[in-house]
A protein has these predicted regions:
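Residue-level signal for secondary-structure boundary elements
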Residues: 54-58, 62, 102-106, 132
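Interaction interfaces in information-processing and related assembly proteins
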Residues: 3-7, 11-92
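Short cysteine-rich clusters marking metal-coordination/redox-active sites
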Residues: 105-108, 124
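Short functional micro-motifs and their immediate structural scaffolds
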Residues: 111-114, 129-132
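Short, flexible, mixed-charge glycine/proline-rich loop motifs
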Residues: 73, 92-103, 114-118
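Cysteine-rich micro-motifs
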Residues: 118-130
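Short leucine-rich amphipathic alpha-helical surface patches
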Residues: 83-85, 101, 112
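Basic (Lys/Arg-enriched) interaction patch that binds polyanionic ligands
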Residues: 109-112, 121
Length: 134
């Protein structure tokens, strides 16, 4: 993901991104988001839902451990989010974002599909044509 979009998510969700500026000996999140810009909206929406849920539940006197991203990357053509904290709701939101990435172009965010052979990437028709079966 571009440094600009990475920074935007860090600013909007500082609690989720608490490990973003730590070193490689402490977290894989130090490398940033390891995927294309097309999944930005999926992540932004998921992070907004996760943080608002945690804030709402904690305000009501219950306690949910803060979700903290440990690594976010493309793996086998889909978004993969490693994290700690949360509950079944936050887990469901993050799994839904991962599943939606299987149908979203990693480069531009348009509807997409995984390529049939080669390095698995989920791309729209335009980006499949641009890159071929990479």
């Amino acid at each position: 993901m571009s440094p600009e979009l990475d920074q935007k998510l860090c600013e909007k969700y500082p609690l989720i991104m608490a490990e973003r500026r730590l070193g490689a000996m402490q977290t894989a999140m130090c490398w940033g988001f390891d995927h294309g810009d097309g999944w930005y909206n999926l992540l932004d929406s998921a992070m907004r839902l996760v943080q608002s849920h945690i804030d709402m539940v904690n305000r009501r006197g219950y306690k949910i451990e803060q979700v903290v991203f440990e690594q976010v990357k493309e793996k086998f053509g889909m978004l993969t989010i490693y994290h700690r904290g949360g509950n079944s709701y936050t887990e469901g939101v993050l799994r839904m974002a991962e599943e939606m990435s299987r149908h979203t172009c990693e480069d531009c965010g348009k509807p997409g599909y995984p390529n049939e052979n080669g390095w698995i990437r989920t791309l729209c028709d335009e980006h499949h044509a641009k890159y071929g079966n990479t």
